[in-house]
Regions:
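Membrane-proximal, lumen/periplasm-facing interface regions of secretory-pathway glyco-
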Residues: 290, 296, 367-447, 533-543, ...
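A beta-strand/beta-hairpin structural motif
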Residues: 602-632, 657
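Short glycine/proline/serine/threonine-rich loop/turn segments at secondary-structure transition edges
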Residues: 631-639
C-alpha cells in the first residue's frame, strides 16, 4: 500500500485546520448569534417534526409560500437526535456548512490547484456570507454543497484516469447530486444550466474529452432530469409551486410591462455585490454592506477575468462562471437585490475567483503570503461586522427573537406561571416559543398588544413587548389604579428592553368596568335595510353576555363617541370578549361594520387580537376595533359586529339562553357623520 507523501499530509492537516477554524466561527456564541430564532426557521422545523411524528414526507412543502423538501428531511433526522430544541434547528446547517468547506477544499484543489483550493475554502470558512448562512436553519445552506458535488463528479469523470466501472459509478453519483439539487433551493435551476454550459465548452475546446466521455455525461444529464421531474411537475402544476416567487418578482413583472428600471438597478447592484453594494436587509446582512469591505472585493473582478481566460484550457471553470452569473438570476428578477440568500449558489465561485486573482502571480510564495493576508483581513472585518455591528442592531433583534427566549427563561424560573405575552405575530411566535423549551406547567397566551390587551380573572403576569406595545385605549390597565404592579423588566441578550412585566390583579377592576360597559345595550335586527330613528326604536335589545356559537361571548362594548367627522376620522369601539373554549385551532375573526341605512358597508375593521389557539377560560380580552371611516358623506351609519370563520366566511350564530339561533350579528348603535 502506497504511503501518502509528506506534501499530502501537510495539505491534509491544513484542511483540518481550516475546518477547525470554520467550526469555531460557527459555534462561537452558539445560540446567541443570531440572537434568537426567526419565523422561516420555525416553518422548516415544524415540518421536520411532522415528518418523524406523522410520516409527512413530501417533495415540496406548501407552507410559508412553498419550498423544497430536502432540508426538511435533514431536520427530521435532527429532530430524532435533539428533539424540539434550538439545536435541532441549527445542527443540519452546521454540518452542511462544514461539508461544503471540506468539499470545496478538495474539489477546487483538484480542478485548479491546492493553493487556490485552500484560499477559497478558508474564505468560505471565515467570510460573513458563509458564516451567517451556516448559523441559520434555512434550506439555502444545502445548494452550494450539491453544486460542488456536481463539479467534483464532472471533473473526476472526465479528467482523472480511473477504471471504467468507477467512471460509471461517478456518473451515477453526479447525476443523482444534480437531480437532488432541485430539492434544495429555488436557485438550483442554474446548476442544470451550468452543466449544459460545461458540455458546450467541451464541444468548443476539448472535443476529444467529449468523445471519450459522452456516455457518462449523458447518464449525468438523464439521471439528473429524471430525478428532477417530480419537482418540475410540482412547480408547473401546483399553484403553491410558484407562489413564493410570485410574491417577490416585481422587477420581472415591471420589465414585462415595459418598465425595466428596477431590473437594471438590480443588475448593477448584483454586479457590485463583491465590493460596491450589499444586501439591503438586516435579516441576512449588515444592511448595504458588500461581501468584502476592503480592496479584497476588487480581486473578485480580476479573478472572474482569469476564469474566463482559463475556460479554453479548463472547461470545468465554466461551471463556476455560471454559478456567479446564472446563479444570480433569482436575485436579479426579485426585490431587494442583491439578496445574499437568493444568490447563494455564487458563494463558492466568489471565493474561488478571489483566490484565482492571487494565483496569477508567478512567485507562489507571494501568492501564499497574500492569501494569508486576504484571509486575515476578511476574518477580522467580517468578524466585527457579524458579532458586533449586526448582532447589536435593533432590527436584527426584532427578526431573531431573543426577547421570547427571555420569556422562556423567566417562565422556567417561576412556579406554574400564568403569562399573558404581547407579540407582533400571534400565529408564528407561539410556535417559535415552543422551541425555546418553556416549562410544561406554564400557562402562556400570546396576544397582539398593538390592538388588544389580555386580562385574567386569576393572578397573572402581563408581559409587554416594545415591538407590540399597549395602545392608549388600554394603557390604564397598566396602572396601579386598576390593581396592576410593575415588576423588573426582562432584557435582551444585548441589555436592551425585551419585555416590561406587570403583576395583574384585575378582578375587581374588571368587574367594575364590565358593569359600566353593560349599561349600554346591544341589539338584534335581522333585516338587511336599517330604519331611521334611534336603534332602540326598531331593534330588539339583548342581554350580556352575548353567546357566539358556544365558542366565545361578548361581555361588553365601549363606544365613546357616536358623532364622527366626515374626514380623517373613524369609529372608536372597544369589544370585551370572553372565550368559552380553550386552545382550539379555529380560523376565527371579528368584524365591525360601519354600514349605510341600505345595508351597504361603508367601512369595516376585521381583527382578532388573541387567536383561538391562545384562549383559556380565565381570560378576557379587550380589542380596539377602530374603524377608519375614510371620506364619509354626512349622515347616519349603523355599527354592527359579528364573528366568522375566515376560511369559509360562515358567521358564528348568536344563541339565546335556550341555545336557539337568534342572529348572526349584533347591532351596536348608530353614529352620525358631521362635516367640520
Amino acid at each position: 500500500m502506497k504511503m501518502p507523501s509528506a506534501s499530502s499530509i501537510r495539505w491534509m492537516w491544513l484542511g483540518i485546520l481550516i475546518l477547525l477554524v470554520a467550526a469555531f466561527a460557527r459555534l462561537y456564541l452558539f445560540g446567541d448569534a443570531p440572537p434568537g430564532l426567526q419565523h422561516d426557521e420555525i416553518f422548516k422545523a415544524q415540518e421536520g417534526r411532522a415528518l418523524i411524528e406523522q410520516g409527512d414526507f413530501r417533495l415540496f412543502y406548501p407552507s410559508n409560500q412553498g419550498h423544497e423538501g430536502l432540508y426538511v428531511w435533514l431536520l427530521g433526522v435532527s429532530y430524532t437526535m435533539f428533539g424540539t430544541s434550538v439545536m435541532m434547528i441549527k445542527f443540519p446547517a452546521f454540518v452542511v456548512g462544514l461539508l461544503t468547506i471540506a468539499v470545496a477544499y478538495r474539489v477546487i484543489g483538484q480542478t485548479v490547484n491546492r493553493r487556490v483550493g485552500a484560499i477559497a475554502a478558508a474564505l468560505i470558512a471565515i467570510s460573513f456570507w458563509a458564516v451567517f448562512v451556516n448559523r441559520v436553519g434555512l434550506r439555502a445552506n444545502t445548494l452550494p454543497l450539491f453544486a460542488l458535488f456536481v463539479v467534483g463528479g464532472l471533473w473526476w469523470m472526465t479528467r482523472i484516469h480511473i477504471q471504467s466501472r468507477q467512471q460509471w459509478i461517478i456518473a451515477v453519483a453526479t447525476g443523482a447530486a444534480l437531480g437532488l439539487s432541485i430539492y434544495t433551493y429555488t436557485s438550483a435551476f442554474a446548476l442544470f444550466v451550468a452543466v449544459g454550459l460545461f458540455v458546450v465548452a467541451l464541444m468548443l475546446f476539448q472535443r476529444t474529452t467529449l468523445r471519450q466521455h459522452w456516455r457518462e455525461l449523458l447518464i449525468v444529464g438523464l439521471l439528473g432530469m429524471v430525478i428532477a421531474v417530480p419537482m418540475v411537475w410540482i412547480r408547473l402544476s401546483d399553484p403553491q409551486g410558484v407562489n413564493r416567487v410570485s410574491t417577490i418578482n416585481r422587477p420581472l413583472t415591471s420589465a414585462l410591462n415595459g418598465d425595466s428600471t428596477e431590473l437594471v438597478d438590480n443588475f448593477w447592484n448584483l454586479a457590485g455585490m463583491p465590493y460596491f453594494t450589499g444586501d439591503p436587509e438586516w435579516r441576512y446582512n449588515v444592511a448595504e454592506r458588500p461581501l468584502f469591505t476592503t480592496p479584497v472585493g476588487l480581486l473578485f473582478y480580476a479573478g472572474f477575468g482569469v476564469a474566463l481566460w482559463r475556460v479554453r484550457r479548463q472547461p470545468i471553470v465554466i461551471l463556476f462562471l455560471a454559478f456567479a452569473t446564472v446563479g444570480l438570476i433569482p436575485s436579479l428578477l426579485t426585490v431587494a437585490a442583491p439578496s445574499f440568500l437568493r444568490s447563494i449558489l455564487a458563494l463558492p465561485a466568489v471565493m474561488l475567483f478571489v483566490a484565482l486573482a492571487l494565483d496569477v502571480i508567478r512567485d507562489k510564495r507571494i501568492v501564499t503570503g497574500l492569501g494569508v493576508v486576504v484571509i486575515v483581513i476578511t476574518a477580522v472585518t467580517d468578524w466585527q461586522a457579524y458579532f458586533d455591528t449586526w448582532l447589536q442592531n435593533d432590527e436584527v433583534h426584532a427578526i431573531y427573537r431573543d426577547d421570547l427566549e427571555a420569556v422562556a427563561s423567566f417562565a422556567r424560573e417561576e412556579d406554574s406561571p400564568r403569562l399573558l405575552v404581547s407579540t407582533t405575530d400571534t400565529e408564528l411566535d407561539p410556535l417559535l416559543f415552543e422551541y425555546l423549551q418553556p416549562p410544561d406547567d406554564a400557562s402562556i397566551s400570546f396576544f397582539d398588544g398593538r390592538t388588544t390587551i389580555a386580562l385574567s380573572d386569576q393572578p397573572a403576569l402581563l408581559m409587554i413587548s416594545p415591538l407590540s406595545a399597549i395602545t392608549p385605549p388600554h394603557a390604564d390597565w397598566l396602572t396601579s389604579a386598576l390593581g396592576t404592579t410593575q415588576l423588573p423588566s426582562l432584557l435582551r441578550k444585548d441589555g436592551a428592553l425585551a419585555y416590561e412585566v406587570y403583576q395583574l390583579d384585575a378582578v375587581a377592576a374588571l368587574a367594575s368596568r364590565l358593569a359600566q360597559m353593560q349599561t349600554r345595550p346591544v341589539y338584534i335586527y335581522n333585516e338587511t335595510n336599517y330604519p331611521r330613528g334611534r336603534v332602540d326604536e326598531w331593534a330588539e335589545a339583548t342581554e350580556y353576555p352575548v353567546n357566539f356559537g358556544n365558542i366565545v361571548e361578548l361581555v361588553g362594548v365601549d363606544l365613546p363617541r357616536t358623532e364622527i367627522a366626515t374626514e380623517q376620522d373613524g369609529v372608536n369601539i372597544q369589544l370585551y370578549l370572553h372565550p368559552l373554549i380553550e386552545r382550539q385551532d379555529l380560523p376565527l375573526n371579528v368584524f365591525v361594520h360601519m354600514s349605510q341605512l341600505d345595508g351597504t358597508v361603508h367601512a369595516q375593521r376585521d381583527l382578532l387580537g388573541v387567536p383561538a389557539l391562545q384562549w383559556t377560560s380565565d381570560m378576557m380580552f379587550i380589542q380596539d376595533n377602530f374603524v377608519v371611516a375614510g371620506p364619509t358623506p354626512p349622515g347616519r351609519y349603523i355599527i354592527t359586529m359579528g364573528i366568522y370563520n375566515f376560511q369559509n366566511g360562515e358567521r358564528l350564530p348568536i344563541l339565546d339562553a335556550s341555545g336557539n339561533v337568534i342572529a348572526d350579528h349584533l347591532v351596536i348603535d348608530r353614529v352620525r357623520a358631521v362635516a367640520p
